[in-house]
């Protein structure tokens, strides 16, 4: 298969004509519990779709929130009185047959670019141990990694976007 296939990344909202196709792919890749969890509706949510030849072949969902209180039971992290924010990737996947073509990397890069525009301090993602392709992708992109445990063993990935000295 030609690895130079063309694809595009776009943000979707529930009123987008391709929303049903997006939801179907999220469900097919078993990410609906993260992508559509009502808890995350209280935050700014972003749904990204990778399209190739008019079809959705990959997705990424992230929220923007304060670092600390929402999933770590920790007070917000502040520097010089300013609360640091992060883009937290909650759901991500690429259809079988479209992997290893740069689609996942492009989705991650788009999320990182948006996080920078939103003034986020970092991008963070947690992934269960059963997703080695995601782990390799994140490590290849330069994310730091740390083992952690929740209901299952998992890995936390963090990509710093700016130092605390940057305003």
Regions found by a protein language model. Give the residues of each.
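Active-site rim helix/loop that mediates acceptor-substrate recognition in acyltransferases
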Residues: 25-52, 59-61, 67-69, 78
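Conserved acetyl-CoA-binding loop-helix of GNAT-fold acetyltransferases
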Residues: 94, 100-113, 139-140
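Short amphipathic alpha-helix that is part of the acyltransferase structural core
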Residues: 1-35
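Conserved active-site alpha-helix within GNAT-family acetyltransferase domains
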Residues: 105, 117, 129-147
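Conserved GNAT acetyl-CoA-binding A-motif
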Residues: 115-127
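A conserved beta-turn-beta hairpin within the catalytic core of GNAT-like acetyltransferases
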Residues: 65-89, 99, 151-153
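A short, internal acetyl-CoA/4′-phosphopantetheine-binding micro-motif in the GNAT/acyltransferase core
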Residues: 90-99, 127-128
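C-terminal "cap" of GNAT-fold acetyltransferases
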Residues: 3-7, 140-167
